[in-house]
């Protein structure tokens, strides 16, 4: 039986991850059901545990992968994460109709990615084009700019530049809660120019090394 989706919070997702791992270990012949594989793969992505995600993807039997397209959809999100393609993460998540056991996890992953993008931009940039910033955080330009203005950032309507404010230690997670929408976000803006994207990608790589 597939594991039921639990309440949408970090503790519940951690508990669900443990349950899925146990179900895989206890599965006959070591082969779990597709719903368990789907939840487990999505949860590894939510935890940003790319090593376990890759190992899981490799050990899922090819027949199960080919018969369950959702698994490939989840892994395509993982590939965008691996490539540090922030706009691509939002686009890929929004492009799929997820099952009800996976959808809450993917929504949480989208929100966690948005938080991370806000944090990285605030640390890596002194200024950024508003359209590029909106693409990084997966929000419409107007909503993204309005939100950061309320957090003390600056924006120049003439140059269409956003000027991030360096966050106080520990303050960013709380202040970014307002950017987690209750409904589906509008279509993601165009992918930012290559120089902006390369700069953020390089900065993410620097932080992770």
UniProtKB/Swiss-Prot annotation:
UniProtKB keywords: Cytoplasm, Nucleus, Phosphoprotein, Signalosome
PROSITE patterns: PCI
Ranges for domain PCI: 8-179
Biological-process GO terms, alphabetical: COP9 signalosome assembly; negative regulation of cell population proliferation; protein deneddylation
Modified residues (Phosphoserine): 175
Pfam families reported in the protein's UniProt record: CSN8_PSD8_EIF3K
Compartments it resides in: Cytoplasm; Nucleus
GO cellular component, one term: nucleus
Stated family: Belongs to the CSN8 family.
Subunit structure: Component of the CSN complex, composed of COPS1/GPS1, COPS2, COPS3, COPS4, COPS5, COPS6, COPS7 (COPS7A or COPS7B), COPS8 and COPS9. In the complex, it probably interacts directly with COPS3, COPS4 and COPS7 (COPS7A or COPS7B).
Function of the protein: Component of the COP9 signalosome complex (CSN), a complex involved in various cellular and developmental processes. The CSN complex is an essential regulator of the ubiquitin (Ubl) conjugation pathway by mediating the deneddylation of the cullin subunits of SCF-type E3 ligase complexes, leading to decrease the Ubl ligase activity of SCF-type complexes such as SCF, CSA or DDB2. The complex is also involved in phosphorylation of p53/TP53, c-jun/JUN, IkappaBalpha/NFKBIA, ITPK1 and IRF8/ICSBP, possibly via its association with CK2 and PKD kinases.
Protein name listed in UniProt: COP9 signalosome complex subunit 8
Upper taxonomic lineage: Eukaryota, Metazoa, Chordata, Craniata, Vertebrata
Gene that this polypeptide is encoded by: Cops8
